[in-house]
Amino acid sequence: MPLGQRAGDKSESRYCGVEVLDFPAGEELPAVLSHSLSSSFDFLLAPLVDPDYRPTPGSVLPVAASDLVLGPAQWSSHIVGKISEWIDLDAEDEQLRLDSEITLKQEIAWASHLSLQACVLPPPKRSSCANYARVVNHILQGLTNLQLWLRIPLEKSEPMDEDHDGAKDNSDMSDTVDSWEWWNSFRLLCEHSSQLCVALDVLSTLPSMNSLGRWFGEPVRAAILQTNAFLTNARGYPCLSKRHQKLLTGFFNHSVQVIISGRSNHNVSQGGVLSGDENHTEDTAVRHALSPYLDYIAYIYQRMDPLPEQERFEINYRDFLQSPLQPLMDNLEAQTYETFEKDTVKYTQYQRAIAKALVDRVSDDDVSTTKTVLMVVGAGRGPLVRASLQAAEETGRKLKVYAVEKNPNAVITLHSLIKLEGWESLVTIISSDMRCWEAPEKADILVSELLGSFGDNELSPECLDGAQRFLKPDGISIPSSYTSFIEPITASKLHNDIKAHKDIAHFETAYVVKLHRIARLAPTQSVFTFDHPNPSPNASNQRYTKLKFEIPQETGSCLVHGFAGYFDAVLYKDVHLGIEPNTATPNMFSWFPIFFPLRKPIYVPSKTPIEVHFWRCCGATKVWYEWAVTAPSPSPIHNSNGRSYWVGL
Amino acid sequence: MVLGLYAFADIAADGAPHLNSAAGEELVRVERAAAVALGSRAPEPPGTLFITTRRVIWVSEVEKGKAYAVDFLAVSLHAVSRDPEAYSSPCIYTQIETEDGSDEESDESDSEVNVETELSKVTEMRIIPSDPCQLDGLFEAFSHCAELNPDPNAESDEENGWAHRDEGDEDMTGGSDAECEFSDVNPIGQTDEHDITHAVVELQINDQRFEDAEEAEHETHGNGH
């Protein structure tokens, strides 16, 4: 049964499995399953075929149990198949290699027949695994629902920095082990198949935190927790080190299922048994040898905080690719406005910024005689108008508001709002595109919320430069500046979702996505910055930036699937608003990050910097980004001439 | 629906239960000389097991008028158990969803009234046929009837309020069709369609069993390099 009840968590990581080490011969499997289920485990990782079997002509596969003994629903829900561990497709011995290929295919075919959801493949036995990958790739192309989980031990030896001698460096290189490299070689050879995933064997020692972080961007489906990884506490019970606990919590938060494996190393007595009651003792089921480990795993799960309400709301959008909005070219729908207007944190920040600007603009002495002219450009259905009027009331300043909106449908709503609130004498509605309108007077303050996930990607610079005509020479723009940021990420799932479209255009499009199963490989760096008022309003908003990212050495090698993009805006002075991870405004949900994919993921060896170029290009009718990696190996320039993705003016 | 095990009294003169024919209840399988064990208690003497399209009814042959029933909607799990280590006799093992979800079993005296109160708290029941060869057939009947009673609490696809653009260039559409296909499958480990939202591994979070160990200092140093 589930490890616990955590509000908002519906993921599969609530279900814990146990590995069957000995082949369950003679129809023992149903009994083993029943025993495990009654001991609160949820599924088995079980051998499908007798490991002593070797293929001979006409022989029948000696399976653990036929589909007459367990029904398809039981197989599908409660068994993850374990492919025979003796299989070695890169063996020197030709007979072993051939036997391995035949048997692997037979076992996978049997698993498909049973409707299993997943099978665990034995780990690569050496760093070279080309033939193994070839056979698996062949199998993958014929699968529909079955997933293959390649078993990978979670290990990485640390290179010794003291050895500067060239000869020793070569020797040291051959001794360096990083199991991530095995996984990377294998999945590259298998063309990044979406049905090839990872089952990590968690051992007693763990690599560095940065190194572990890589796996959260990979399709890890299970963590096989060895009993040897557990420590013993003062009471003789199994427990985990703090680093293992942290890793486990990370797995739970990323839908990774735990499978407990190994022999019991802790003999904890069952204190609750009434030894005096002979009748009772006889009927009590024998407790599973690994139950103390399961109890501990459940303890770690139940100790986790509930998912925050906002996370629960957004959980269905995790790693879901969306096209960015085009508010300048398209008219937004009521539902879109409705959703964004619920972001109270955003409008609180705007209200704070407007209040500060009002106080700076009009001294306390002049409050009764001075009226501030404020223009909301891109008023939508009015939330910024409301924030402005509330700021005026809060600061005691008098305000004259112009609400400029080009969407005629939103203007209808605006009229209703102003009548409803009795703001007729304070607010004038202008149904016009701010780029074409001629204002009757200059404004002291210009307020807008034209920001996209990358800051300028909804063409805020083009709009606000056009609106600068309305502003007094010493006037204030809110926002006063905004900056975009990027960082390289591993994101297997996003890559596979884009690949499913089978074209270049989708790999040259930026997506808005709530990033979840990703590895952030290096700290963010800023890309483009825009200031308002623009000191040179007639200058072009074209931009070009070259960036270099250094990945920490202890991370090891990694694969870059693309770049996560964020923004941070200075609304006014110290009032910020943004989603850049280091400075993100808490509890805001108007923006998800943006993702710039690479057509081909780029392998980055350890200690090698990444060099990336970003361009912001402007045409007569559209604005677009181009991006390319030039080191460690060059990629094509993505979205050349805006051929795949652009934002309409 | 009724959660938990309950006493059943509507038995005809020939010992067969009256079915709710008006509600479409039909008999699927009868098993003579089957014992039941409730929770960790000793098995009751053999009776007759009736599996209908809606519930499992067991009628005692020794004690007139004694019978138990449980709706299939409350049976969250059923499995064949043959391992003597798990249970001494081959049997059908079932888990029953109860009203309060508590695993607590009282040690109260064995009076008639208390027995009846206790029924609703039973979370495990084993059906022990006198002939173990009948287990597979019983399991099949259980599976068939469980499918006839899907969980009404199964999660519905509520549409989230988040904005999705339908207009615009179709090529720009994000998201993946594969996503929808995959999410239709139950997660590995989930029992049939019954998502038991309140039956979980029971622990006392402040249980001293889960204290951290003293971690060796050399390990810390090793990781630091």
Curated annotation (Swiss-Prot), chain A:
Top-level lineage group: Eukaryota
Keyword Cytoplasm found = yes
Would the keyword rRNA processing turn up in this protein's UniProt record?
Answer: no
> Which residue intervals make up region (Dimerization)?
491-507
* GO cellular component terms listed in the entry, alphabetical order: cytosol; nucleus
Q: What is its main location?
A: cytoplasm
Which residues does the record give as S-adenosyl-L-methionine binding sites?
337, 346-347, 405, 433-434
GO biological process annotation, one example = regulation of DNA-templated transcription
Please give the catalytic activity noted in the UniProt record: L-arginyl-[protein] + 2 S-adenosyl-L-methionine = N(omega),N(omega)'-dimethyl-L-arginyl-[protein] + 2 S-adenosyl-L-homocysteine + 2 H(+)
Pfam families documented for this protein: PRMT5, PRMT5_C, PRMT5_TIM
Q: Which parts of the sequence belong to the SAM-dependent MTase PRMT-type domain?
A: 321-627
The GO terms describing molecular function are:
histone arginine N-methyltransferase activity; protein-arginine omega-N symmetric methyltransferase activity
Question: For binding a protein, which residues are annotated in this chain's numbering?
Answer: 340, 449, 458
Annotated region described as Beta barrel, given as residue ranges: 479-649
**EC number(s) of the enzyme?**
2.1.1.320
Tell me the InterPro entries matching this sequence.
Arg_MeTrfase, Arg_MeTrfase_PRMT5, PRMT5, PRMT5_C, PRMT5_TIM, SAM-dependent_MTases_sf
What segment(s) does the record annotate as region TIM barrel?
Answer: 10-300
Q: Which keywords, in A-to-Z order, does the entry hold?
A: Cytoplasm, Methyltransferase, S-adenosyl-L-methionine, Transferase
> What job does the chain carry out?
Methylates arginine residues in proteins such as histone H4.
Into which family does the record put it? Answer: Belongs to the class I-like SAM-binding methyltransferase superfamily. Protein arginine N-methyltransferase family.
Q: Which PANTHER family match?
A: PROTEIN ARGININE N-METHYLTRANSFERASE 5 (PTHR10738:SF0)
Name of the protein described by the UniProt record: Protein arginine N-methyltransferase 5
Task: Give the source species.
Answer: Oryza sativa subsp. japonica (Rice)
Encoding gene (name)? PRMT5
